[in-house]
Structure formats: structure tokens, C-alpha cells
């Protein structure tokens, strides 16, 4: 059958004090028959996912928590953390090497300011193991859609007009695992794939104009 995906999400925000609020979000995604289309989900190690990431289906949970301080009108501050877990990933052998499930991802960050008032400044850190999420469906800005990577990003944003935002970012990432054990090059960052984004450290400045509808 064709690949399908369904999901649900629940979240909310509550005032803790007059100037502090907190919130949380929980999501669950079920990818049915994800292995039916290699263009939809690739577990060949080329983009980070290993053959142990999923067999037929993929079930991934995600949760984010945050707290916001609004003590200064033009300089609110938000701290946040997020986790993701692939319930279908497993340990096993890939290319003759023993591999862990590599199924738990996490990240955190802080934002200060308001793009509509003066500007927004943010910094984030993410740790995305090989099988924690579906490669190519993860953060494309930070890691180009690859898994088995960790790194940070810093960005500044300013609203130019209603629903139009200019954003400057700098992203730096590197592989989490680079084992060369087993037959050939092992399961992580195999050299037969000539992808600099997958194998090498990445340092990338980026400029975006975002339109909101």
C-alpha cells in the first residue's frame, strides 16, 4: 500500500505570574508503510537513518516545553526545550558493526526580543541521533535534513513590513558518530556517498526573507 502519515498534537499555555507564562506541546506521528517508497524515507545510511530505524512503519513522539518572561515590553525572553523519540528504532548489526537504537533526540534554546519591536535574537542547540527522526523531514536549516548530527545555530530577525520578516542565521554542525568499523566504512557516514553535508563539519551563514500568510 501507499505510504501514509497521521498525527495528533495537544498543547497549551498558562500564566504563572503577571509577567511569566509557561506552556507545553506533545505530538505523535505514525508513518504507515514508510518503507514502500525509498524517495519518501531512505534508511540506506545516505542521509543518516540506518536500516534499524524502521522496518515497515515509523512511530515518532515529540514534546516541547517553554517559559516566557515579559518583564520588559520590547525585550521578552523565551527559554525552550524539545525531545523526540522514535519508538520503532532498534539496535542491531549494520555492515558488520553493532549499532545502538540511536532513537532519542533533544535540543534547547533561548530567544530574546521581538522582531516587530526592535529585533529577535535566538540561539539553539540540537542533538539528532541517526534514527531519532526520519531523515529529510528534520530541521533543514540546521542540518540540511540529515540525522546523526549535532550543533548550534544563532539567528537575528526583524520584521520589515506586515507579515514579512528578514532573518540572518549562522549554523554549525558535525556528525555525532563517525565509526569506520565493520565491512567497508561501517554504518555511520559511509564514504561511498560523496555528501559533504553528511560527512564533514558544516559552517553556513544564511539569509532569508519569510512571508507569513
Label every model-predicted segment.
Residues 18-23, 28, 38-213:
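Outer-membrane beta-barrel pore domains
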Residues 34:
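Active-site-proximal acidic segments at structured loop/helix or strand boundaries
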Residues 1-7:
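Internal, well-ordered domain-core segments that constitute the primary functional module
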Residues 13-15:
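Basic phosphate/pyrophosphate-binding loop/patch that engages nucleotide-derived ligands
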Residues 31:
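Short, solvent-exposed loop/turn segments at secondary-structure junctions
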Amino acid at each position: 500500500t501507499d505510504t501514509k502519515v497521521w498525527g495528533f498534537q495537544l498543547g497549551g499555555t498558562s500564566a504563572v505570574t503577571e509577567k511569566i507564562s509557561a506552556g507545553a506541546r506533545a505530538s505523535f506521528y505514525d508513518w504507515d508503510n514508510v518503507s514502500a517508497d525509498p524517495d519518501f524515507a531512505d534508511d540506506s545510511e545516505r542521509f543518516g537513518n540506518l536500516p534499524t530505524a524502521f522496518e515497515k512503519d515509523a512511530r515518532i513522539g515529540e514534546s516541547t516545553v517553554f517559559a516566557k518572561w515579559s518583564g520588559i515590553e520590547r525585550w521578552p525572553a523565551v527559554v525552550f526545550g524539545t525531545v523526540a523519540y522514535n519508538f520503532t528504532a532498534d539496535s542491531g548489526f549494520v555492515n558488520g558493526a553493532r549499532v545502538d537504537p540511536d532513537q532519542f533526540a533533544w535540543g534547547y534554546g533561548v530567544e530574546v526580543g521581538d522582531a516587530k519591536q526592535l529585533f529577535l535574537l535566538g540561539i539553539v542547540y540540537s542533538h539528532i541521533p541517526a534514527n531519532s527522526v526520519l531523515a529529510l523531514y528534520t530541521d533543514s536549516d540546521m542540518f540540511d535534513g540529515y540525522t546523526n548530527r549535532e550543533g548550534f545555530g544563532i539567528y537575528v530577525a526583524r520584521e520589515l513590513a506586515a507579515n514579512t520578516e528578514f532573518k540572518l542565521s549562522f549554523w554549525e554542525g558535525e556528525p555525532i558518530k563517525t565509526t569506520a568499523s565493520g565491512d567497508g566504512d561501517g554504518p555511520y557516514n559511509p564514504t561511498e556517498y560523496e555528501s559533504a553535508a553528511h560527512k564533514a563539519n558544516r559552517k553556513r551563514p544564511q539569509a532569508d526573507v519569510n512571508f507569513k500568510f
